[in-house]
């Protein structure tokens, strides 16, 4: 029974005793027992007076004996892991807390650079999914979970809620660990007390996995714990895929750490083993069994800070950072998708002016931007410069040039010329890939026939105009 319940029961007992005493006193007065009392009533009267007196000061200041705190198995080992119990409603969870000075580096960057990148977002004025403009560093909760399974659903339990956050001159890692399934209410109570101090989650696939898992488990106990905060959410996985899908073998966090962040893990427990270790822990209750999971999660939430710093620097300062041409192209494509044509044009030009193999892809994209702006002449000039390069020219360059010549400039001959070149490029590519579609071939042939017909019609019209002109001249001379 909880301490609160015991106090309520004691209060009820005291009220009953007081009522009983008052009733007895009334009966004695009504019977005319005044002045000298018979001996048999003397003792009862003394007891009554004692019962009706207010509680003495010593009684009021000495609360009932506290409930014994739950015994923590292997408490000394938890202490070595920098973890301590959090007790709520007779249940406990473990909270591990590790602090780092803000100037410490994790991989390529110091944690303190988070201040700089937030200021950069503020100064840029750009509307971007990863923007932290208007936020303080402590508003960002770099969050990750560990669960009993890698799929979703109510049967999947979140047993570790981990995050890192800047607090003053330190980066604090906190991990809320579930030592037994029946303590889930206490787990979320402990987490929500801390999480509500921030406004935005920063995760790696958190929109699709981590936070939906938290919401699902929270729904089952929502009447016993506070509501989940209405967090903003910056999911870095989506940005990582935009930037590095074509460049890296995988966009897993571990690969990105090595290739982009200079973070190299030693003796790291693979994430897929976390559920196995947790079930082993439930059997033994020995924290040494789960230590590898805690260390893995700690590195995850620290790497999220480093990754956010790195991605922000690429997005806002790619012209002066050590950015690959592939990254520069993908950054430009991201800005184009967001409707920021000026930023997209800047990125594409950096690639177009290089001798990189993606140069013609960048020129094609620049032409598309000019076309969107209805600057058709500039678009055609960019595409024609692309055709003159010695590197591979995508067939789409010829297709786009043909469309502009046909629909904007009504130059049938030029449109036909570029369409035939596109068809030849398509046949070469299809031969290499063994993937030539009959539908594609038919589409090319129809376009060529249509342009040839337009060309013949244009020539006939021109011949008719010339013939008419000569007839008119002859008529004038005969007058």
Residue ranges and their predicted role:
Residues 170-255, 259:
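Conserved DEDDh/DEDDy metal-dependent 3′-5′ exonuclease domain
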Residues 128-200:
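Conserved RNase H-like, two-metal-ion catalytic cores of nucleic-acid enzymes
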Residues 331, 365-366, 400-401, 415, ...:
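Structural register within alpha-helical repeat arrays
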Residues 335, 363, 370, 405-406, ...:
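Residue at a conserved register position within TPR or TPR-like alpha-solenoid repeats
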